[in-house]
Every structure is written in structure tokens, then in C-alpha cells.
Amino acid sequence: MVQTSSQSTVNKIEMRLRGKGRGSIVFQQDYADCGTPSAVKSTFHRMYTDGMLVRLAHGIYYYPKADKEYGLGIIYPSVEDIAQAIAKRDKAKIVPMGAYALNRLGLSTQMPMNVVFLTNGAPRRIKIGNGRGILFKHSSSGKNFAYKSELMMLVVTAMRTIGEEKITDEERNVLVEHAKNVNDNDFNHDIKLAPAWVRKILIVR
């Protein structure tokens, strides 16, 4: 039996999805070689309506993984997972900013509706539903992306977000404790990238 063009497109996309495995974030444009633009678009739309894929944002889908241990249904990716997948696809680096950096370190219980990342890639805003979004702000400063330790990067970002004049003793203590978990080689490299007032606080870790 001869396959139609649309059937061939479906088979190619399904095979690639199975190869990536459940729990993967996928981009429709990465499957452009599987068929004509209309065939690829209709295949993704059909997979979404059939429940095979979850649509996270325009052109961005999730090949869902279920929680088999507790039966809690689909394990959805975090905003961080989505942002990192976009950065990886674009071959860009990203740095969490503002309220999200504070949330990551336990300094705030509020999860911002719009999570902000600095990027050395293209600036853009991704709408991910329910009023939430991911905002990528372009930065040409190499310092922002030169950290060896992600934790150290978060600590410095959080301190800069709070500000030298507004940081409390409690916040200072929490951040110093986080910095203690950075290995010495990374710390000695990364501390040089921080503002002078941040260095004075963290150097006593």
C-alpha cells in the first residue's frame, strides 16, 4: 500500500517524537523536513487535538509524560524547562532575572506571571497561557553569561535585584548560605564578576 504524503509526514513526526521520548519539549519548525509546511502544521494540530501533544505556546509543544507512581496525570514542564529548551534550540545563554531569581532561591513565595531572562540571543516574549509569559531581554554584556556556577549566578542576580540599600540581614544570611554551596574553584572565578558591594558580602562565606 502506497503512503500518501500526509501519512508519510505523520509517520516521520511520530517516529522522531518517540525517539526524543516522553517529557520532551518540541518545536514545530524543527520538523519542517518531515513534509510540506501545511502537512506539518496540520499534523501537529491533529496531534494536539488528539491529546498526543500538549501545546505550550505558539509553535511549541510538549510530548507529555505521566506520573505513573502516584497517578497524578501529566507532569508538566516548568517555566524554567520551557525557557531552557528555547535557549538550547536557539543556541543562546539565559540568566533568570528579578522576582523569578528571588523565587528560585526561596526569598519570595510569589511566582511572577511574566518570568524574565537575560539572553545573548534574540529578544522576544513567549505567551504560555493563563496570562503567563516568558520575556527574553537581550544583553550584550559578556559578564552576565560568564558564570561557571548557576547557583552563584542566581545569588548575584538576586542581590542586584534587591539592591545594596534595601537588602535585609535575613536576606543577606540566606544568600551567603547559598553561596557556601558553590565549590571553591567556581566561587573564586565568579566572585570577580559580581559588583563590589556583593563581593564584600559574599567573600566572608
Task: Briefly describe each language-model feature range.
Residues Q28, N114, E170-E171:
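Short coil/turn segments at secondary-structure boundaries
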Residues Q84-I86, M97-Y100, T157, T161-E165:
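Positively charged, aromatic-accented nucleic-acid-binding surfaces
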Residues H138-R205:
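Hydrophobic alpha-helical interaction segments
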Residues R89:
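Basic nucleic-acid-binding interfaces
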Residues V40, M97-G98, L151:
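Amphipathic alpha-helical interface surfaces
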Residues I82-Q84, G133-S140:
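Short amphipathic alpha-helical segments and their helix-coil junctions
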Residues L56-G59, A92-I128, G133:
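Short gly/ser-rich loop at a beta-strand->alpha-helix junction or flexible surface loop bordering the NTP-binding
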Residues V2-A85:
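Short beta-edge/loop segments at beta->alpha junctions of small alpha/beta modules
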